[in-house]
Regions:
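Catalytic-domain carbohydrate-binding cleft regions of carbohydrate-active enzymes
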Residues: 1-175
């Protein structure tokens, strides 16, 4: 028979999609399926999947890698991809993968700069989410309401809201 090694993501996405659709038939609703996953396979966009890059560590190198990863991923024909704004792991941890560079988190001006740049970039991704461990992600946690970083984040937040009609209508075309 045919060898299949990495297509579990496709079958997993299909199972979630079909399960949600079956439940919707019972209650008469017709909502779009939304499945946030970090695994991908060709064709799974038909099952309402959104891929994200996984739990990354906060560093400028990781941020640079996220940009190229997002561009390459979307070139594959899967329209929905996102990243954890500012990385998932901010501090340095015990495990090899927990390799953040900012133990003082939002008290470190260097992390505030990195987070702000990441936020500015993610504003233009299909899915916009600040998610992670080690520190809170609310805008006011980033140097207070009068601060330079807070103001930059606020401006990008306003821009994101202005882009929502475009993002939503474009999403409807590819869904």
């Amino acid at each position: 028979g045919e060898a299949h090694t990495n297509d579990y993501a496709l079958y997993h996405a299909r199972a979630i999609y079909e399960g949600q659709r079956a439940e919707q038939k019972k209650d008469g609703s017709n909502k779009r399926v939304f499945n946030l996953t970090r695994s991908a396979w060709t064709g799974q966009q038909q099952y309402g999947t959104v891929m994200w890059s996984g739990d990354t560590s906060a560093s400028w190198k990781t941020f640079r890698n996220q940009i190229s990863a997002g561009l390459n991923f979307c070139a594959s024909g899967l329209p929905y991809w996102t990243a954890d704004i500012g990385a998932f792991f901010v501090k340095d941890g015990d495990s090899w993968y927990w390799d953040g560079k900012y133990d003082d988190t939002t008290n470190d001006p260097a992390y505030l700069e990195l987070y702000t740049r990441w936020y500015q970039w993610c504003c233009f991704l299909p899915i916009f989410r600040g998610h992670g461990t080690d520190c809170r992600r609310e805008l006011w946690k980033f140097d207070g309401e009068g601060g330079m970083f807070y103001q930059a984040l606020l401006r990008m937040n306003a821009l994101r809201y202005k882009l929502l009609p475009y993002i939503y209508s474009t999403a409807g075309k590819v869904w």
